[in-house]
Amino acid sequence: MQEELKRLEKEAVEKVEAAGSLKEVNDVRVAYLGKKGPITEVLRGMGKLSAEERPKMGALANEVREKIAAAIAEKNARLEEEEVKRKLKEQTIDVTLPGSPVKTGARHPLTIVIEEIEDLFISMGYSVEEGPEVETDYYNFEALNLPKEHPARDMQDSFYITEDTLMRTQTSPVQTRTMEKHKGKGPVKIICPGKVYRRDNDDATHSHQFMQIEGLCVDRDISMSDLKGTLETVAKKMFGEEREIRLRPSFFPFTEPSVEVDVSCFKCGGKGCSVCKQTGWIEILGAGMVHPNVLEMAGFDSKQYQGFAFGMGVERIAMLKYGIDDIRHFYTNDVRFLSQFKQA
């Protein structure tokens, strides 16, 4: 029996050393140290031994089991260490290699234009205000000098939700709400970017939803010259330092006097081309002095305070600035179109 145990020990240790994987080592462990292994079978025959030989054989069997287990543990440790080294070698990163470029998207052209206009006016002391897109009839019309049954309401068809609420047709309500917060004390210098909604049929130049930026400046002794100077700054910033503007008389219920503002054509320099329709001028926005009724309804004394206001369509400015011929391009999510503004 002693020789058999020694033979099994030698045989098991040799198989452990020859194993090339953790699985093979485990197979050896099960084969020799398991309940059905040969060492267990040898131990079952100890009952045939004398009382004197039995303790010696038991101690020898335990010694053999411990040596085989130690060989298995050592082999497992070596194999695990080799596996770690192999994985580290496979996953080694050369830190001297240049990094992979990150795939970035592009800012939307409307976002670019809005941020450019916001930055300009913030540098001039204006703040940016926002308001609800679902507006009351009062703020969208009445507070802007368009009482019920006023004929000027026909100028823009609206999306009504109830009799007294609608999707705002302009960002002008933000101006009134802001003036009310000031409780009749100036100055008020704000711009109001946001979405507006009108019942237009979508085509190359019209959309039922579009972006608008309106501006308001209310203080003592504000005049048309202040308005003109502000708009000249906007035109030069957006379309180039060589640009000039001209004011044409117009009508808006919430301003008096009211003007349409044209900028000298940035394509032909005012000589006449297809962009300016041979006139040398391009219309960019509407403006005027805030109507006294609007000031009074917002809580300002129109005899002490004056103001000017202006409004521009962001899509129109972007179309002119980037030479885009169809407003629908802004809303189709076409990557080919949007990727052109990656460097903007």
Swiss-Prot record:
Reported cofactor(s): Mg(2+)
Subunit structure: Tetramer of two alpha and two beta subunits.
Cofactor: binding details: Binds 2 magnesium ions per tetramer.
Gene Ontology MF terms in the entry: ATP binding; catalytic activity, acting on a protein; magnesium ion binding; phenylalanine-tRNA ligase activity; transferase activity; tRNA binding
Protein name: Phenylalanine--tRNA ligase alpha subunit
Subcellular localization(s) per the UniProt record: Cytoplasm
Major localisation: cytoplasm
